[in-house]
Every structure is written in structure tokens, then in C-alpha cells.
């Protein structure tokens, strides 16, 4: 049974059982700083299980793409070497949110495996939590599983929790028995680490809430979370013991083999590298599709590590030219129908992989040469020095796990203590991963409130002032009954017109006025999605829970923010029209002062393109069409062509913002009523923020007018300095720059002539030290280039001498040292130049016979030169 058919059969089976198909979420978890990547099928439903989000269905089924590379779950180093380790995989899962429980889910799982897929019951082995008599009874007495094929296991294997506190419960796992010809015992036995029994499905029963003391309280509405790896199930149904022998990987392995000219199965090393490429092209392609690009930190660094590991294995297969991007097309052919977003992003993925591989290959050979030299004489079991590991990472871009991969092949170990020490000495640690649970702890009070309070009613689309009731107050991270004058705190209302920061739009500011108090709102946030929190300060009086307040948004700021937000939609559409449909929004910020828009594009936007973008956006503004908003089913909105932002999570119904025929996007932000309200659009800057990601900053309305007037003032001032009319400024500036270049050339010639004259006269001033001519001199008004010219002249006159020249120009010191080749065993030019530079706060280096340095503090130069003279005498004496 092919993987595509397995995936479809799973989804269809659970639809028949009343489940709603939920499309796969991106690999980037939304609003969850605790996770680097989506690593399980339940991640998109985490807020539902926590009670922070409601869905219009209580039963769900999905085929969720997942990543395990970086962070707590990291399978990268084992990928290619084992039968079942992957960076990217698909998790089939069915979920119940307070609907069915153990009896139903166990029955669903058993019938799907044995009836729909036809697996022999005698090939399945069951585990339950050692204290879960209910699940054991269902398996044995209702399903009819032989007690001899059921194991009771401890908390480590069969009790699941979301964290130290919160929802948790026992789980039951289903294993497949591959047969006695494969070593290994059943789960729970001393031989369980063998490969005979392979877990294929985990059924998690969320029935408890664990508090900080460890006490378990039964949940009023228990839920179910299940997960089954498609790759493992495909191996079972296709009669193979290795996931890489399934149809999920075989076409990719065949494509990699064709590109490299190798044959899969010819030898172990070749097979490992081909499996690495097949796995890594899946991970890299979906990461880029989901908005991640190679970078030096966070998720982008994980992607970079995976790409570079793939390139290294490609090189092992003899691929000496850029190749990795050629595997995208075979992947799209296999998975594009199940994940159409991959098909849409194919060209962008190919470009990103090609750029990154080209960049890495520039240093790959040099890095490998350094490593080969370092390990050439190491015996098996020896350690690669930490200094080498660090230098490979810092200078040649070798992720540490890539070096570890090579160490594994050579039967070497890694000196990680030495690596850490080298990194500390350099004070330039490699990028750290995202994460940490501290952010979650700081929001615990929000979490508790979200569990108790209803959804905040937001009225801000239709009004900027409304009445609301104070339902919670927070000060210093704790719930309080009141806030007094001078207190900084947080106010939560049952209804509010204040927009909470989301979708790139800044939160509203304004004030809350009760009969007895005035609270100035400086920001509005939505930390738990549906809970609006107003941050600010009590200006007067005392604000208490239960008080009624008039919530008034700062309308001037709101209008400016709305103008910037609507302009962002116009900018997005203009970019796609002018640069191409590959442009995708990668981030944005809109507030009253400006807009910032990040988007995918492989190269800087030219000045001509920026002018055209600005012209197109302003033309749309002048057309003054209305900005229409509608609530539609998500499928209908997408059918109409509304752009969805990748990575955003949408419900069954979405808000569509349409601006004539120019732009239509899914958006929950506030907008102008008509495009003419934007006024004018002015681009301030265009820059790069990461590989393949560009940023445009712009302003609208009154802020744009101020920017235009500032530019005009600068133009007038510059014209005044050059004593010309503004219209003639460019011509006069070109003339002035040309004259400046001529003067600089003349000055360089004067300096060279002076250096020649200085060199000619200085040779006679050399001091004899033990038969060696030594010349150490300070020269005023000479820069580094002039010093080099002087040194060249002097070395021709004193070929067996020691020379140090110091040039002083505009409070900067340039230093150069030359040592005759026959003297470098006694005097090293690099050490010599540093004896002068270091007392001046500088540093230099170079070859034994020639070195340079730069420094400041010319007042201390004479003393430093005298010290250098004594140092040379000590070396030659």
C-alpha cells in the first residue's frame, strides 16, 4: 500500500467516525516560544487542550508535518545511519476535545489497523500504563487482545505530560512485530531495545491536571491525542524493515543516485549518504516553504546545519558542483499533491538551496583540508582538538554536528570541553537556539485568567469608545483586587474597543475612565489569543475589579495605524506585481509612526523598482476605492483568491479585507474606510535582514509629508553649501567629487614622493646591533600606504636589517615592521609590531618577515618605540 493511499485511508476512516479534517499546520509553531519546530501532531491543538481556544468541532484528524532537529528533540546526528531516524516526518493523528475517550479511541485504532489496513492481530503488541486497569481491561476483554501480547510499563514509557504542570495522563502504545528473524524482545522486556517490535501508534489519554505540587486532579472533560508516524506505518504495509525502503524515500534516493552516478546498495557509506540526502531534502524544502531561510541563529541556523550536512554528504558521493536544489523537483512530484504549498514554493525553495550551497562550497574545501590535516595522525578513539572544532565553525562555517559526523566516520571523539573553552576565549559563541520555558512562566497568570474568563468581546472594528467592566487586575505579575494612583499594571475588561497587538499591528493606546479613576493605556496585548490586556498606569484615583469604565482609544493614533496597515496590503500587492509572485510576506510591523514590511526576494530591490512600487501604491491610493471587510468561510475566501499569510492559524471563518481589484487578504487588523484616507505613501528605506529576506520601511499621511519636507530641507541645505540651485545640485556634486578624486591622487603622489625621500635618507640612520642594522623611526603625516612604500625602499637598502616605521596621521598610528629573512628565527615581525601596537591599544599581525598594525594614542608612541628598540636588542644581543 503506497504512502499516499495510507494517508488518504487514515483521513477518510476518521471522517467516517465523525472527525473534521484539519490541514497540516506549518513547521513553525504559532505563538509558542517554547518550541523550535512543530514536533508532534498535537502541537497545533495545544491551546485547545489547554482550554485557551475553542474550535467548532470536537473531533479532529490530521496528517501533520513535523521536524525533530535542534532543541530537545534532535535526531540529526543519527539520520542516514539508522532505519527510522528522520529530521522531517508526517504524524497521522486523531483527536478528541472532551468528546470520546479510551473505549472509543482504542476501538478506532484497532479496527483501522486490522480491518481497514488488514494487519494480522497476532502481529500487534500493546502496552498500557502500569496503573491503567481501565485501558488494559478494554484491550483484553473488549477488543480481545491476548494477555500474552500486552505489557504494563512504567511512567517513563507510558505516562504523557505537556509540561511540569497542566494536562497529562496515561498512554497506550501499539507495536508491530516484524518477526523472530529480527533480534529484540517485546516492549517492557530486557531485550526491548532490539528492532523486532516497532512502535507505530501512541494513544494518549489526557485525563488529569497536574499542579505544582504534583497532585493529579481528574479533568471534567478528558481528551485524546494520538500519533502514528506515516513512515513507520508505510514500512509495515510495504513489507520492509527500513523506512528508507518505502515509496516515501525510494524516489528521492533514486534521484540522488542518478545525480551522483552512484548505486544504492553498493556499499554502506554510499547508502548512508544517499539516505541523508533523501531525508534532508524533505526537511529543508518544507522549512523554506514554511518561511525559514538559512541564518546564523534560531530556526534558520538549524536549516543551515541540515543543508551543510547534505552538501558534505553530496561531496562524499563525488558531487563537486552545486546539486542539492536538483532534488526539489522529485520531492514535489512525490508530495506536492498532499501539500500544494510545497508546489507553489518550489522555485523559491530551489533558489534558497542553490544560494546556500554556493556560499558554503566557497569554504568547504579549505575547512575539510584543515580537518584532514588535524586528524591525519589521530588513532581510532582519539579526540579531535576543541580548537580545531571551534575554528571550523567560526571561520569555515562548519556546524559542530557536521564535524561530529566526520568524527563518527573516522571512529574519533570530539573534545567538546576544548571547544567550549575556545569559544569562551574568543567571546563569540555560536548562535543559540530559540526557546526556554521562562517566557511561559511569566505568562502563567495570563494562562490562569484565560482558563477562567470568557473571550474578551472586541468592539473596535466599529467604534473607538465603549463601556466595559473590569474583570481582572494585575500588578507585578500577580492578580490584585485594585490599582491605585501611580501603579503600573494590567487591566482586563469583559469588552473593549482596544485592538490587541497581533498580525504585525501594534496594540492601541488611550485611556480607561471610571467614576473614581483614570488609567492611561500605553499598549494592548493578546497574550492568550482571545484575552485582551491593557497595559499602563493609574493616573488618578483607585481602579477596582467590578468597576465600569469608558474605554477610549486614541483615535489619532488608531487612524495613523490603520493607514499604515492598509498601505502594507497595497505594498504587498505592488511587490508581487512588480517583482514577481514568489514574493511572500515574512513579517510586518504597523504602528502610528511607520510601517515595516519583510518579504522574500533573492536580491536587493533596485532604485528604479522602488520608484515604480511607490508610484503604483500612490496610484491605488488616489483611486480612493473603499476598503471592504467581510467574514467568510476560509475555503470560500481562498477560492476567491484572498492571500493567506503563511504560518498564521485561521479558524473556519476568516475576515477578508478587499481593496478593489488591487488587493485581497485574510486580515484581522484595522483599516481605512477608503484608500484615499491613506493620503500619500513614501518609502524610507530598503535593506536586507537575512539571506533571501528584504525589508521596506515606509510612512503614510502626515508622517509621509514630514519625511518629504525633511528631504526637501536637506536638499536645500546641500544646494546652499555648494552655492547652486537645487535643480543643479547633482551636476555640481559630480564636479566636486571629480575634483576631490583628482586632489586625492595628487596627495597620494606627494606622499609617495615623500616616502621615497624619507626612505633614501633614513637608511644611513640605522643603528648597528650585534652586526645587524636596526632602524626604528616615527614619521609624521604618513598613512599605511606611504609607510609600505618607504619600507620597500628601506628593505632594498637594508636587506638583512630590522625595520620598524610608525606613521602618525589625524590621531591614528600606522605601524609596519620588516625583518630580513635570515633573521626571522631570532626576530618575528608580527611579535615586533605588536610590542609597539599593544601599549597603544592596538593589535596587528603578519608573516615572520613582514607585519602591520594599527593603533591610537600617538602621545604614547615614542615610549612604545623605545621599548621596541630594547626588545630588539634583547633578541639580537
Swiss-Prot record:
The keyword Metal-binding applies. Its EC number is 6.1.1.7. InterPro entries: aa-tRNA-synth_II/BPL/LPL (IPR045864), Ala-tRNA-lgiase_IIc (IPR002318), Ala-tRNA-ligase_IIc_anticod-bd (IPR018162), Ala-tRNA-synth_IIc_core (IPR018165), Ala-tRNA-synth_IIc_N (IPR018164), Ala-tRNA_ligase (IPR050058), Ala_tRNA_ligase_euk/bac (IPR023033), DHHA1_dom (IPR003156). One of its GO terms (molecular function) is alanine-tRNA ligase activity. GO terms for cellular component: cytosol. Its cofactor is Zn(2+). SMART domains: tRNA_SAD. Signal peptide: none annotated. GO terms for biological process: alanyl-tRNA aminoacylation; negative regulation of DNA-templated transcription. It catalyses: tRNA(Ala) + L-alanine + ATP = L-alanyl-tRNA(Ala) + AMP + diphosphate. Binds 1 zinc ion per subunit. Keywords: Aminoacyl-tRNA synthetase, ATP-binding, Cytoplasm, Ligase, Metal-binding, Nucleotide-binding, Protein biosynthesis, RNA-binding, tRNA-binding, Zinc. CDD domains: AlaRS_core. It is found in: Cytoplasm. Catalyzes the attachment of alanine to tRNA(Ala) in a two-step reaction: alanine is first activated by ATP to form Ala-AMP and then transferred to the acceptor end of tRNA(Ala). Also edits incorrectly charged Ser-tRNA(Ala) and Gly-tRNA(Ala) via its editing domain. Consists of three domains; the N-terminal catalytic domain, the editing domain and the C-terminal C-Ala domain. The editing domain removes incorrectly charged amino acids, while the C-Ala domain, along with tRNA(Ala), serves as a bridge to cooperatively bring together the editing and aminoacylation centers thus stimulating deacylation of misacylated tRNAs. Belongs to the class-II aminoacyl-tRNA synthetase family. This is Alanine--tRNA ligase. It comes from Acidithiobacillus ferridurans. The gene is alaS.
